[in-house]
Amino acid sequence: ESYVCSDANACLYKLGMFGERLILEIFAFEHIKEPTIDNTHANRIRLLKREGLIPKKIDDILYALRKTRNDAVHAGADSVEDAKTLLSMTYNLAVWFMEVYGDWGYIAPAFVMPENVVQPDYESIIKEQEEKIVALSKQVEAVSTAASTKTSKERAEKGETASESMELSEAETRYLIDEQLRKFGWEADTNTLRYSKGTRPQKGRNLAIAEWPTDSAVGKNGYADYALFVGVKLVGIVEAKKAAIDIPSVIDHQCKEYAKGIKDEHQEYTINQWGAYKVPFVFATNGRKYLKQIETKSGIWYLDLRSGANAPKALQGWISPQGLMEQLEKDIAAANSALQNTPFDLLRDPDGLNLRKYQINAIEAAEQAVIDGKQTVLLSMATGTGKTRTILGMIYRFIKSDRFKRVLFLVDRTALGEQAEDVFKEVKIEELMPLDSIYNIKGLDEKEIDRETKIHIATVQSLVKRILYPEGDTMPSVTDYDLIVVDEAHRGYILDKEMSETEMLYRNQDDYISKYRTVIEYFDAVKFALTATPALHTTEIFGKPVFNYSCLLYTSDAADD
């Protein structure tokens, strides 16, 4: 606190150290061994997250402290505004720690930002603090003993509750949203990349420009919290609010008005006009992760203003600059028409996929479900009936008609992914070429995708790591894939039991299902599942099968042949 105004660089560095110390205290309290390999602060946080001990909001604060500490050490970061924002967030972090690992009945006093004292009386301060240390040490011993009587599960539940009751200011929320936007490919810094400080759209940069002025009379004198630009194209408006605000109402009462009120001098940045709207996409958020229980007060709410039929919906993460440009290129009505008018001759070709009637029927059922607007689709086909070839044919038609831009083929074990890769490479489908010669396919060994990628084969485990325990400073965009095809995901936990302890991602079957569902629901995509034996959690996510082909039918058809 004493450094916040006099030496912001030192303040940022020491706040980061506080975050490190707090994590080490949790390890000691929970009797958890620190990682034997790559024992870094970031990896220790990931380990505690896997144990369910670090809620999302706490993780966001710890990330901000760690990132800014590194910037302070290596880049000389010394923003007083950042130091003040992080100081108040760190106070909230300390309160959370006290509520979980100290006194469960603790009621924290309001945080008071320290004044810029030019020459403090250090001797008096030291004497006062030494007296406090003696008194507090006795209290700490008592409350720590009380907290240690609780189980780790109880503390995890308490930690989640305490983090959700934490109220961040709008400035703190904006700071965390800056960090989130940067993870998804946007340049964002509320304190420096502001309209009032001369920041304007530039070719080759993806800028989230803060406090963008509009002619709207709503909100803060018509200033949008962020305007999103891909190069010099205005593609989105973002409003950031405190946790207590109903987020969808912000889209109706503010975001839409900002999208209508783009100033005449900024018309050069607009792409088109959709009715009264001059911006295609709007977002509203309070920085809190999406929770179904408090749906309207969590998540990132998004609305595509290009059609009045679109309704606001909650997203699990942000859309990247590339993702928004791909959204602009979509024409679902035209793609559905192309899909319906594409014949099945290639899929029946004996020199190609050579699909049988029931496999064509499965694809037809899947396509009709998509045209009808279903977001989740389940196909049930008995073992040995050629699910992988059916999937290949279905994916080919969806991409060929441009109904979907990029497909995630998600498997529960490496062997299934390798099997799919082999089929995609070997089976001829068009002009005697296999799918991987027609479209860009990324295999199991490739984590990153690019604009040209059409199919990405990945395991559930790899996506859990990328989404829940990311190792770098980037996150997958929620629109990286617009179709997810899941093959036999119900067996994933059985395979994971065979992993070594250091590789374990799931504590038990319920934890596997929870994380599996998180991966599935993270992306704003149509989701398909193909399975021989639908598990309960599979039908809970995907619904009842739109197509069912049993062993009995397969045997009967084979006999007829």
How should each PLM-predicted stretch be described?
Residues 98-406, 415, 419-430, 452-455, ...:
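ATP-dependent helicase/translocase motor core
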Residues 554-561:
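Conserved small/polar residues in nucleotide/adenosyl-binding loops
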Residues 456-483, 493-513:
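Conserved RecA-like ASCE ATPase "motif II neighborhood" in helicase/translocase motors
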Residues 543-553:
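A short helix-turn-beta junction within AAA+ P-loop NTPase domains corresponding to the substrate/partner-engaging
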Residues 1-130:
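Amphipathic alpha-helical interface elements
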Residues 383, 512-538:
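Conserved helicase ATPase motor motifs in RecA-like P-loop NTPase domains
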